[in-house]
Amino acid sequence: MVAVAAKKRLTPIPEHCFPVTFRFQWYERNRRRDKDNVSAFGRKVVLDGLVQAGIMPNDNWNYVEGFRDEFYVDRDCPRVRIEVYTYAE
């Protein structure tokens, strides 16, 4: 599902911009899940989807510099917002 959405909305990251850093903003319905459970599984799904969609060639150390996670509660609209910071920025 992530790969399908990524293909529709994103363009591939140019090779010269790697490695990239991801900023994840997690909006949960409530505070029931531990933050590490939200981010660890969520990051895996998102990054694998970006690779599968062809947005980035791989999610290994050569392509991913790191992560920044932020957590919020939004009872009406749980979601994740992702920003990608490239090496060139």
Positions of PLM-derived features:
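Catalytic phosphate/metal-binding cores of nucleic-acid and nucleotide-processing enzymes, i.e., regions
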Residues: 1-89
